[in-house]
């Protein structure tokens, strides 16, 4: 029922022009301008609440271009070893020069320089450089779903699964991660996330204040990677936490559409 309501509202947004939606969204949800980019602010808010980016010696930034998650983490840990992987054939995704040129930042792109985490050669290079070595892995990847918002969960499934596998390869025991997720209505999505969180002592689903409340973006924050995973069933708890954010999103989508109708 919640899924149907959300999909109907998302479809409703498509009846308005992109310019109108952007203006209404900014009016409703954007706070006064700040000098920090939104992605920086999101990780800063996550860190202030959960303290995952402090005292980091080595971290990996997955699908992180243009690099604000990496930038924030390096600002707190100026002497750390930082690794980043992002697509190089998309100008939106590449790391900006202020990140790329940092002496302690290494970009992993694979032999063909693609930076594609689905490429086995890129995965191999990541595992060689970062395997079992990272205190923190950040995974902020997403697939462009413009015009196909109701398919966002399905379109991002493979990427999120790939990121979870790389997180488990690269985190040392005791390490933490921040993983962007979207909806989890489908059985395969919730089962994938259930299997993943069993590798950690604790986990929580969170939407930072700078993440626009009408979208489906949330972050799964996992603490203290285990040497041996649990065999717990967290499906009900995952569904409960997701439902809380579905209801918040529903409320804010209604606000957005009501404003657009004026």
UniProtKB/Swiss-Prot annotation:
Its EC number is 2.1.1.57. Keywords: Methyltransferase, S-adenosyl-L-methionine, Transferase. GO terms for molecular function: mRNA (nucleoside-2'-O-)-methyltransferase activity. The active site is at residue 180. GO terms for biological process: 7-methylguanosine mRNA capping; methylation. Residues 34-226 form the RrmJ-type SAM-dependent 2'-O-MTase domain. Coiled coil: none annotated. It catalyses: a 5'-end (N(7)-methyl 5'-triphosphoguanosine)-ribonucleoside in mRNA + S-adenosyl-L-methionine = a 5'-end (N(7)-methyl 5'-triphosphoguanosine)-(2'-O-methyl-ribonucleoside) in mRNA + S-adenosyl-L-homocysteine + H(+). S-adenosyl-L-methionine-dependent methyltransferase that mediates mRNA cap 2'-O-ribose methylation to the 5'-cap structure of late viral transcripts. This is Cap-specific mRNA (nucleoside-2'-O-)-methyltransferase. It comes from Autographa californica nuclear polyhedrosis virus.
């Amino acid at each position: 029922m919640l899924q149907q309501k959300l999909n109907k509202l998302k479809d409703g947004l498509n009846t308005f022009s992109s310019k109108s939606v952007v203006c209404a969204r900014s009016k409703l949800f954007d706070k006064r301008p700040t000098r920090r980019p939104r992605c920086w602010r999101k990780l800063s808010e996550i860190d202030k609440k959960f303290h995952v980016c402090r005292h980091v010696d080595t971290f990996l930034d997955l699908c992180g271009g243009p690099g604000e998650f990496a930038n924030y983490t390096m600002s707190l840990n100026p002497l750390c070893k930082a690794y980043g992987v992002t697509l190089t054939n998309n100008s939106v995704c590449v790391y900006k020069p202020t990140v790329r040129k940092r002496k302690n930042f290494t970009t992993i792109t694979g032999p063909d320089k693609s930076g594609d985490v689905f490429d086995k050669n890129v995965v191999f290079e990541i595992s060689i450089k970062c395997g079992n070595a990272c205190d923190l892995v950040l995974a902020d990847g997403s697939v462009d779903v413009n015009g196909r918002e109701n398919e966002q969960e399905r379109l991002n499934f493979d990427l999120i699964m790939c990121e979870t596998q790389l997180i488990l390869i690269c985190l040392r025991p005791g390490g933490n991660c921040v993983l962007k997720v979207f909806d989890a209505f489908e059985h395969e999505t919730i089962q994938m996330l259930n299997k993943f969180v069993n590798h950690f002592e604790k986990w929580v689903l969170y939407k930072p204040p700078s993440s626009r409340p009408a979208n489906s973006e949330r972050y799964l924050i996992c603490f203290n990677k285990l040497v041996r995973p649990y065999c717990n069933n967290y499906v009900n708890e995952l569904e409960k936490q997701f439902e809380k954010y579905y209801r918040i999103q529903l409320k804010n989508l209604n606000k957005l559409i009501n404003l657009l109708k004026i």
